[in-house]
């Protein structure tokens, strides 16, 4: 059973500069909620309850976002706003599930995942790249279900336009594999 997720967050975020020189892209709000929270909520809904965040020294704001109890308590004390109280409760729930690993030099995704080796329990985990947000269905739940059927590694992919090829990783598949899982 898959209960852990690795989430690499140490990237430089250069495509969104200059905004990401101030705010990590993972904390950029989408409809009032940081991107990384969408990932956490989807994973929790899929049964994952342990997260390993890979960050760099330049991404301390991510750690601060989730572990800034003193700030929340100070605000709640001054202003008894139910929305803020609810946010704090949600953050406290996340705190129990998150561990941090540092990747101080950008040596790629493989290096980042290798840094998590000591924290991985068992042989199975999810790795979620926070660059693309999939709103439609719970992709994590679907991937776990497919993994349980196939008992092999699963990769979520999407078809892209030729104009976007330079910004993406390419994956070539055989026709037989395409037909099997369509």
Identify the residue ranges that each predicted region occupies.
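Single conserved hydrophobic/aromatic residue that forms the stacking wall/gate
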Residues: 172-182
